[in-house]
Regions:
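Small-residue hinge/turn detector
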Residues: 170-182
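Glycosyltransferase-associated regions of secretory-pathway enzymes
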Residues: 1-169, 185-388
Length: 388
């Protein structure tokens, strides 16, 4: 009898233990655990016949992904100068590629019926397959500047304060190239050759950050009657990488001068003929020449002297100065019939400019007109501006 009772007790004990173990195993998944969701899905999808548990993926790749998404730390920029803010916002890396952007500005967009530069616009698209080609209207331009220069509010203030369209157009080209890089070109220009051919093959692209051309090389005693500088670099076509110091300098200069004249009540008094010195090729040329002689960027101890117009007058092929390539007058002004410029079919001809100058009075639109023989005759450029 005793043995029978012992057997019954033992059986009940074994069944109780089995029941408790079974409940514990079934309730385990409801406990919150720190497992990767992807690993949980993989475990559920595993075949029932596989006794080996599926291990969760390692955490290291996840940490690497977080590191790649990190941005530059925000810092207090209130004590910085405009130049320092610009340098922090868009640091310069000469080894990066030239961005595949083409920037232009006009009152209408190319898809509008009254857009009058369809042939010129198409030439840039045709010669630069795969490039992003944007024609920025005035309304888009101000919003773009607000976005790109949110950390440098004085730049936005200066841009909005400029009352003449040509002043804003000049300023915009520097601003968009500094922030995004690529090519800026006036709406009345034709692309003769792709920009991939602008630099000689012997020059490594990772060593150049700015490509410019000569606008004027007036080798004559009375040059100052016709041009602002003895050598004048054009700014109707510019190629650059983001953050280039020349662009940083000219943006700083225009911003300071604009806001200073605004405070003095002189800004509204600027006239069309002041544009060249304020935002145009004169101040652009000055910024470039100063860059060539700046000890912050060049080892002047190895220089043979000051770099000035003498280094560029009469040149017929490209010339490199540090990270800048200067193209001869034929490259961006072919066919003007003066100052050594050759025809548009010359191998060094890259861009043809119609010299539309729609912001100027009609009497001033053709920059190539110059008097000869004491002013009795005038020589006009071969290319004529489209009818206005």
């Amino acid at each position: 009898m005793i043995n029978s009772r012992r057997a019954i007790v033992a059986a009940v004990f074994i069944l109780t233990v089995f029941f408790l173990l079974s409940r514990s195993h079934q309730s385990a998944p409801s406990v919150p655990v720190a497992k990767d969701a992807a690993a949980a899905d993989t475990s559920k999808a595993a075949p029932a016949s596989n006794p080996d548990p599926v291990s969760p993926p390692p955490e290291k790749p996840k940490e690497m992904e977080v590191k790649q998404r990190r941005t530059r730390p925000r810092i207090d920029m209130s004590g910085m100068s405009t130049y320092e803010k610009l340098a922090y916002a868009y640091p310069y890396d000469v080894e990066t590629k030239f961005p595949a952007y083409i920037w232009q500005t006009w009152k209408q967009s190319p898809d509008q019926a009254d857009f009058q530069f369809k042939d010129q616009h198409a030439s840039w698209t045709d010669e630069h397959v795969g490039f992003v080609h944007e024609v920025i209207t005035d309304d888009v331009a101000i919003n773009l500047i607000r976005l790109l220069y949110a950390t440098v509010p004085e730049v936005i203030d200066a841009y909005r304060s400029l009352h003449l369209p040509v002043l804003r157009a000049d300023f915009f080209r520097y601003l968009i190239l500094y922030a995004r890089g690529g090519i800026y070109t006036d709406i009345d220009t034709y692309a003769i050759q792709s920009s991939v051919k602008w630099l000689p093959e012997k020059i490594p692209r990772e060593t150049i950050g700015l490509v410019i051309g000569i606008e004027a090389d007036p080798d004559r005693p009375d040059w100052a009657q016709w041009y602002s500088r003895r050598i004048q670099f054009c700014q109707w076509t510019i190629q650059s990488k983001p953050g280039h110091p020349v662009l940083r300098e000219i943006i700083t200069r225009i911003t300071k001068q604009t806001l200073s004249m605004k405070r003095q009540g002189k800004l509204e008094k600027l006239l069309d003929h002041d544009v060249v010195e304020f935002t145009g090729p004169a101040v652009w040329t000055d910024a470039i020449m100063e860059y060539f002689n700046d000890e912050r960027f060049f080892d002047l101890s190895r220089s043979k002297g000051v770099i000035d117009y003498k280094n560029f007058t009469g040149m017929e092929t490209s010339k490199r100065v540090g990270d800048v390539v200067v193209l001869p007058i034929t490259s961006f002004s072919p066919g003007v019939g003066q100052m050594g410029a050759k025809e548009p079919d010359d191998p060094m001809a890259f861009v043809k400019h119609d010299f539309e100058g729609t912001w100027k009075p009609e009497s001033e639109r053709h920059m190539g007109e110059q008097k000869e023989d004491g002013g009795e005759q005038q020589q006009q450029q071969q290319q004529q501006a489209p009818a206005q």
